[in-house]
Amino acid sequence: MSFLRKKINDVIIESVEISRATFKEAEDFKKLLNQDIDGGYLKIIVDLSNCTFMDSTFLSTIVTALKKVNKIGGNLKLVGVHSETQALLELTGTIKVFEIYETKDEALKSFTVQSISK
């Protein structure tokens, strides 16, 4: 299993359960994220704790989902970003568009804080 989906209240957590996320897995992950967004989930966490490498195609899939969910008032946050992925985010400039958290709990709490402050 490459991906694991968990629902906590109105938040979806998509965990990438492979060490190397590449173009080979990007299409399947894109389908999952689109299912989440099309299903009405506006709060998405992508957990990369088990993923030590990501290529630009896989990153593009996540950026596209972020843009899609942002357009309808939602957000997508990253958790557990490893150093190689961090370097890719910095190199591509996409680090500026993501909220990144160390843990799922921190990301979940950030959604709660956003809801209260709106």
Residue ranges and their predicted role:
Residues 1-13, 45-57, 68-69, 108-112:
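Charged, low-complexity, helix/coiled-coil-prone segments
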Residues 2-31:
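STAS-typified acidic loop motif
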Residues 23-98:
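Amphipathic alpha-helical interaction surfaces in cytosolic regulatory modules
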